[in-house]
Amino acid sequence: MNQAPRVVIIGAGIVGANLADELAVRGWVNTTVIEQGPLHLAGGSTSHAPGLVFQTNPSKSMTEFAGYTVEKLLSLTKDGVSCFNQVGGLEIATTPERLGELARRHGFATSWGLESRLIDPAECKRLHPLLEEEAVLGGFLVPSDGLASAARAVQLLIEKSTAAGVRFLGDTAVTGIEQADGKVTGVRLGDDTVIEADIVVSCAGFWGPAIGEMIGMRVPLLPLAHQYVTTDALPELAGRNPGPHGASLPILRHQDKDLYYREHGDRIGIGSYAHRPMPVDLDTLAKVPAEKMSEHEMPSRLDFTLEDFLPSWEDTKALLPALRERSIEDGFNGIFSFTPDGGPLVGAAPELEGFYVAEAVWVTHSAGIARAVAELLVDGQSTISLHEGEVTRFEPIQTTKEYISEASQQNFVEIYDIRHPLEPRSSPRDLRSAPFRARQEELGAFFLESAGWERPHFFEANRQLLETLPDEWRAPARDSWSNRFHSEISAAEAWKTRTAVAMYDMTPLKRLEVAGPGALALLQRLSTGNIAKKPGAVTYCLLLNADGGIRSDVTIARLGEDRFQLGVNSNIDLDYFSVEARRQAAADPGAWAHVADITGATCCIGLWGPLAREVMAKVSEDDFSNESLKYFRSAEVVIGGIPVTAMRLSYVGELGWELYAGAETGQRLWDVLFAAGAEHGIIAAGRGAFNSLRLEKGYRLWGTDVTPEHHPFEAGLGFSIAKDKTGFVGADAVDVLRNQPSERALRCLTINDGTSMVLGKEPVYLDGSPAGYVTSAAYGYTVRTPLAYAWLPASTVEGDQVEIEYFGRRIPATVAADPLFDPKMERLRG
């Protein structure tokens, strides 16, 4: 048996302690955990965390991380007392809008397999007698939610891991990360000694950015203070909680006022997000000697600012009348970690091989994410997908100090807000735009934001098309929720794309150039496609993990013998290719490949529609006939005097090309195409139409329809694996999966009434029981019906009847053909 690698974990809070235990369970005990504070109470967020665990999350992965945390803490016991008190979690609504949101959250829970139910005000009052029943419109109850004893759990995990052979060092500062040849070699301590290591994992919480700086890594995390108070004793709670946990009422969340509550014996604890954001400069934190560290004195517990809490105190007394004669006995401003998108930061650092992070992880998800990191280290991938929490998911502009501060503070303000899935952040905005932004604004573009990019959703200039839009292209009226960030203009834009020609801004699609003598070998090894084709070939393929999970889907265009252009999904893909290229060059210096992000230096216009060739004939002398430039081929062409790389691809299912040019010529390219297409009725179209058209065509969206937890065959993407290809990452798993019946499949659904809309993540019922969930949905303007894609049992077949639960209402739907539009690909290949 190979000896386990030497692992150093920085931080002995709830994440670091759980990770040490998860590694030990897997036989990795050559581990050292370093904590700058005393081991009995480290002084970070874990030490003052109130411990409320509400498992339900719009993210499937985050809900599953929370579920494992509950499971593990329940099993972590001493003297017959576990580290989790399963009192249940109750979220209440005091406004009609919140009541609807609770129904949506019940849908999330059902989709992800978490037992929950919606309850009336009387049931809320019965479960939590302190409530003012008249103020409550309804509630959402998850019986398995509850209270984590985080500090106690850390102590038991330390005892358990120590017994297994793990070493813990308290009161020990880390001053540097040692490295050689691009790999981590150890951790330097405050006394200048070095602990040698093959792997270092930073679980330093809000101190994480300081650890990241030691290797030149930007950790996009902002420490913010959050208020928590404890009342004096309530006669109503006297003698109610004699047990070791000191709580029996369900944990309570009053999101309409940004508040949450729990019992502390005969007192009530109150947490508030209703105050101003309070960024914390860690350099100003007081140094607390180990001998003085206590529950009331620690670095992460700051002085209470009563004036910030007073509005929340009034809101609390309105909801809990028993507190109207009570007072605040204790309060503090506690430091927690916030990120630009509210997610955790997990995974390998591309800057240094062997360095990992697991930060911005709250108690709720701690054991689940620790297990995922342990699986990542030991097995190479985690059981639960980490794609939403990958530390490398942010674009460079999203890791600047200014962006991290502004976006993280905005997330604090909006933490309990009712957020529509299409709702863009309010700030920061206008960070990245296509070079033809001015033209888009002239056409009245309505922009949504993604990864810092401003992307047109529809164009107000196309409203005039509604006057001549055929009746059969008009969509039924929507409910108020699905109508948000939607415009009927999208119907006209879809109509023009299918019947004439439209221009789509594809500039935000991330583009890489991979070049060098090892480029082909790199791409052949990492992708499922056969890339060894003649220059001009374009290949759609997948990137898999070793288990066959889909880590991304990409298009690879061979522009020259040793030069390729890739369309990828995110910064995660850039870092994956970059790291693998470095490893390849280290093993064989002659097989080097340079990986560059060319997105910002280029632009892309999708020119699609049955009249696209007529437009090209007016602006280029190059041959765009089917014989000259076939489907999934590329060519270097000149359009209006501008050098352009044209790729015969279409994500909307129509004839056309993705046209790539230098950013400096982008506006000129737009103007040339728009002028040439005028006589053919050309329009600019947005993402609203785009999403509808791509779903009609059955095109999957990575990160939404498919993730690393899915494999190609169940996702309907088996065609992207080159026949007889071997030796690529995931090939062994593919051989097994190809001949193994799948338990689930991605199915196309049509809505039976032809009018009701869903948006995604809703539960799907089969024979009256939850059986899956919606991934994407839209109104299909061409196919004249609302449609959705959903993960369902593989036994479902075309014609089967299901129901989609949308805000508590069951909507009948039918399993339909996939795709619904142009299944023979005649329009694309024409």
How should these model regions be labeled?
Residues 64-67, 92-101, 140-159, 169, ...:
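Short beta-strand to alpha-helix junction loop
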Residues 24-45:
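Glycine-rich FAD pyrophosphate-binding loop
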